[in-house]
């Protein structure tokens, strides 16, 4: 998990996104039909279930179901395996989506930097395939 943080300090930090901040590029950039993620559990449902702030994510509805199952079948803690699996799987998919978003942000920052360097070279008169006068014989 810490590999992206190591890359921030050892390599170019300008193209490494900050994991604490929201992405700087629009989510539909390159994906015109991309749907926005929506929360299934409402704020009131999460308050009623007394979920902590760390538990209020896109998988909160699965966690609410799991906690209700554990409460309803208290002595038998093995009765909620299916709900536990659903919640764990949702958390895994959420983690994978966040890592893909992080990687997408990193690649878009690299692309932005490459384009800025290319524009700077063109502005100096060194376009694609051109050689500067000091190099030419």
UniProtKB/Swiss-Prot annotation:
Coiled coil: none annotated. Keywords: Disulfide bond, Electron transport, Lipoprotein, Membrane, Mitochondrion, Mitochondrion inner membrane, Myristate, Phosphoprotein, Respiratory chain, Transport. A motif (Cx9C motif 2) lies at residues 80-90. It is a peripheral membrane protein. One of its GO terms (cellular component) is respiratory chain complex I. It is found in: Mitochondrion inner membrane; Mitochondrion intermembrane space. A motif (Cx9C motif 1) lies at residues 59-69. The keyword Kinase does not apply. A lipid is attached at residue 2 (N-myristoyl glycine). Contains two C-X9-C motifs that are predicted to form a helix-coil-helix structure, permitting the formation of intramolecular disulfide bonds. Accessory subunit of the mitochondrial membrane respiratory chain NADH dehydrogenase (Complex I), that is believed not to be involved in catalysis. Complex I functions in the transfer of electrons from NADH to the respiratory chain. The immediate electron acceptor for the enzyme is believed to be ubiquinone. This is NADH dehydrogenase [ubiquinone] 1 beta subcomplex subunit 7. The gene is Ndufb7.
């Amino acid at each position: 998990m810490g590999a992206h943080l190591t890359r921030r300090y050892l390599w170019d930090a300008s193209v490494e996104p900050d994991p604490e901040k929201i992405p700087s590029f629009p989510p539909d950039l390159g994906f015109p039909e991309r749907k926005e993620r929506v929360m299934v559990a409402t704020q009131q449902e999460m308050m009623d279930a007394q979920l902590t702030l760390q538990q209020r994510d896109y998988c909160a509805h699965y966690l609410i179901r799991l906690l209700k199952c554990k409460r309803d079948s208290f002595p038998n803690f093995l009765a909620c395996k299916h709900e536990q699996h659903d919640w764990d799987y949702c958390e895994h998919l959420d983690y994978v989506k966040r890592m893909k978003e992080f990687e997408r942000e990193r690649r878009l920052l690299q692309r932005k930097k490459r384009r800025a360097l290319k524009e700077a070279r063109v502005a100096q008169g060194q376009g694609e395939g051109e050689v500067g006068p000091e190099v030419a014989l």
